[in-house]
Structure formats: structure tokens, C-alpha cells
């Protein structure tokens, strides 16, 4: 994997920095594990915008990724690594000994031809999945469940991981990348290693059009709007907004805490770093 900074042969390539991975499959994805993906433009069932800055973009297929890894005791061989337009991480197509193929998140260091295994008796090596109670202290893990059997929800993006720092009865304590220390049931599953494609954060798209290809629309500043559109809007000439920064709905931004899920506060040992 290499970081390539393009020469300024055009305005769009002047700031283009891309990640080149020659291990990625260049052909078509595995068709039985594809699903249709319709665009919403950020609108809900009433046609109202619920998520801003979404719309357009290239048509994509959804890759059905196995986040549960429940095929215990059946070894699988990595056939190839693939690009996935739906996430920052790459995915791996694996062939199980019983003939079934599945997509999984590709951890760092996994290559075509490697073998992986799920279950209690799996060896301690990247790509293998097992319950948290069977993972040694200090291990780096990813694709972590929050509830047993629900599927991975934590540490799924490129370059992310968590560290297992303590075990206490029915719970284990994890240190997340944000600095948060959190308790999770020890029956939840996780995969060893960190997610690959960590260079993803170093890329630069180079031009606005590259964001539009990905379905991302422009972000307009509130002070550039009219008063009907934003609390910072209006005024004669350029203004500072006239108040502390807020969202379009008047909620303070820039560090204002909005977490309201008190029910799960008991699982958070230490809040994330600011």
C-alpha cells in the first residue's frame, strides 16, 4: 500500500493524494453477496431533509458483510481483498471449507491465501473471531459486538481498533480510540487485530467533484444564509453571526454535550477525551 501525491497537471490533481493498494481485486465483486442500494438524498418517508449534505453520487451496490462471524470451527481461506464503496475499510472475500463464501472486514496484515477461524478454540491471530472472555488481556481487537449475537458495531472503520484492558466477571473493559473506557458483556464477540487501510485518513480528494461522486453535497455556512434559514443568517454586509455558534436548529455547537442515553451510562467507566 502506498500514498501517491499527484503532479499538478491540472487544478483537480494539484492537491490530489490517493492511496494505492495493488492487492485489491480489480474485477467485479462477488454477485451473490451484492444487494441493491437506493438513494434517499437525505430525505425521510415524508420527503423532508433529515440528514444534510447528501445527494447525487455514483450508483453503488451494497456488499453484504458478515458482522456476526458465527461459523464456528469451520476454517476459511481468504480468496481476495476488495474495495467497498460503502465504508472506509476494505473487505475480504473468504471461502469456508463447506463451500460458502462471505465478505468480512479486512484487518491489517490479512492477505489472499491466509486462513481464518471463528470460535472459542481459534488461534490468537489477526482475522480470527471469538468471545471477548477468550481474548488475552492487552489484545488489539476490532469489529466488536455491543450485545451478544447482534453483530459488530464498534471499531469498523479504516484503521480503528480497541484494546482489551480488564476482565471482571461477566464484563470486560475496553479502551476505545476516542479514549473512552467502556464495559461490554464478555459473551460479545470481537475480531483480533486492527482494521486495515489505515492510510485512508491521509488521502486528499483534490477537488469538489470527487466529493460529489461520493454523494456528498456542499456545506454552506450559517452566516452566509438568510435569517429564515439559520440563526446566524442575515445582517448588513459580513457579520460574525451575532451569538455563540449554534446549529440550524439553535442547539449550541463546538463542544456542547448532547448525549441523552442515561440507561447505558453505567457501562462507561471513563468518558471520551474532548
Curated annotation (Swiss-Prot):
It comes from the Bacteria. GO terms for biological process: cytoplasmic translation. PROSITE patterns: RIBOSOMAL_L2. The keyword Ribonucleoprotein applies. One of its GO terms (cellular component) is large ribosomal subunit. Keywords: Ribonucleoprotein, Ribosomal protein, RNA-binding, rRNA-binding. InterPro entries: NA-bd_OB-fold, Rib_uL2_dom2, Ribosomal_uL2, Ribosomal_uL2_bac/org-type, Ribosomal_uL2_C, Ribosomal_uL2_CS, Ribosomal_uL2_dom3, Ribosomal_uL2_RNA-bd_dom. One of its GO terms (molecular function) is structural constituent of ribosome. Gene3D superfamilies: 2.30.30.30, Nucleic acid-binding proteins (2.40.50.140), Ribosomal protein L2, domain 3 (4.10.950.10). Residues 223-274 are annotated as: Disordered. PANTHER family: LARGE RIBOSOMAL SUBUNIT PROTEIN UL2M, RIBOSOMAL PROTEIN L2. Part of the 50S ribosomal subunit. Forms a bridge to the 30S subunit in the 70S ribosome. One of the primary rRNA binding proteins. Required for association of the 30S and 50S subunits to form the 70S ribosome, for tRNA binding and peptide bond formation. It has been suggested to have peptidyltransferase activity; this is somewhat controversial. Makes several contacts with the 16S rRNA in the 70S ribosome. This is Large ribosomal subunit protein uL2. It comes from Colwellia psychrerythraea (strain 34H / ATCC BAA-681).
